[in-house]
Amino acid sequence: MSKKWYVVQAYSGFEKNVQRILEERIAREEMGDYFGQILVPVEKVVDIRNGRKTISERKSYPGYVLVEMEMTDDSWHLVKSTPRVSGFIGGRANRPTPISQREAEIILQQVQTGIEKPKPKVEFEVGQQVRVNEGPFADFNGVVEEVNYERNKLRVSVQIFGRETPVELEFSQVEKIN
C-alpha cells in the first residue's frame, strides 16, 4: 500500500501541538514506515503597524492537520487516539477517505507560496482612504484606486498641489484610515 493524504480534525488552536505529539508517538511506536509528512498548513502574513513591518504566521485551515499515511488499523488508531484529535474528515468513522492527489498538491503549493511570498495581513479595497507613512508622499492622505496583491502594491490617488495624482506605493508605505 502507498501513503495518501488524510485530513485530521484537531481542536482549534492546538494544531501545532497535535503535529508535535503525533510525530513523537510515531517515533515512540516505531511506526515511521506508515507515515510521511505531517503538516499544519500556514501562510506568512505581513502586518504593518506604525510604519513597522512584522511577519507572522496564520493557519490556512484552522482546526485541521494534514497527515500523509498508509491507512492500517494500527496507524488509524495511533492518529485517532492522539490527544486533541476529533477524528478524520471524509469517509466513515473507521475508514476515512483520503483527499485526492490533486487536492494535496494544491494545498502543498499554497503552503510553499505562502512561505515564499508573505500575504498582507491588512486587506486593501478600491475606494478606501489611506495615509502614506513613508517615502516622498509621507503624511499625505489618498484613495486606493487599484490593488495588486501579487506585487504587494497599491495605486493611490493623492492630492498634490490641488490636483489628484496617481502614485504607486508598496503596502508597507500606507496604513488604513479608520
From Swiss-Prot:
InterPro entries: KOW, NGN, NGN-like_dom, NGN_dom_sf, NusG-like, Rib_uL2_dom2, Transcrpt_antiterm_NusG, Transcrpt_antiterm_NusG_bac_CS
PROSITE patterns attached to this UniProt entry: NUSG (PS01014)
Highest taxon listed in the record's lineage: Bacteria
Cellular component, GO, one term: cytosol
Family: Belongs to the NusG family.
NCBIfam families, per the entry: nusG
Name under which the protein is recorded: Transcription termination/antitermination protein NusG
Lineage summary: Bacteria, Pseudomonadati, Pseudomonadota, Betaproteobacteria, Neisseriales
